[in-house]
Amino acid sequence: MRTVSARSSVALVVIVAAVLVWTSSASVAPAPAPGSEETCGTVVGALMPCLPFVQGKEKEPSKGCCSGAKRLDGETKTGPQRVHACECIQTAMKTYSDIDGKLVSEVPKHCGIVDSKLPPIDVNMDCKTLGVLHYKGN
């Protein structure tokens, strides 16, 4: 039986938060500047409940996951924040194979976050394009 390490939990939470970078919903205080240590700390605390869903262990995100996702949705709106989040996703996806990128992309939909603006993110994406582009999903 494999236990989840703190490092893998942090990476997962960063991934889920990055997905939320492109969504629009509730307004909250702005996130710290991209690259600051506080950004990942905030994400970790809010999105830890999403881990079982994005690993495919649960069919739906928990209420705690959705609550954190909605809060973080309002904290990551600028181009630089999207670039930083995308880079975090790529790093984590290269490191942890038990995170399903498709499930990460589904968190906003499952949590009722409307007007999701999520581009397809994979390890080959040029994250810097997110500083000027704002993808509007279908």
Curated annotation (Swiss-Prot):
InterPro entries: Bifun_inhib/LTP/seed_sf, Bifunc_inhib/LTP/seed_store, Plant_nsLTP. GO terms for molecular function: lipid binding. GO terms for biological process: lipid transport. Keywords: Allergen, Disulfide bond, Lipid-binding, Signal, Transport. Gene3D superfamilies: Plant lipid-transfer and hydrophobic proteins. Residues 1-36 form the signal peptide. The keyword Transport applies. The keyword Disulfide bond applies. Pfam families: Tryp_alpha_amyl. Disulfide bonds join 40-88, 50-65, 66-111, 86-127. Belongs to the plant LTP family. Plant non-specific lipid-transfer proteins transfer phospholipids as well as galactolipids across membranes. May play a role in wax or cutin deposition in the cell walls of expanding epidermal cells and certain secretory tissues. This is Probable non-specific lipid-transfer protein 1.
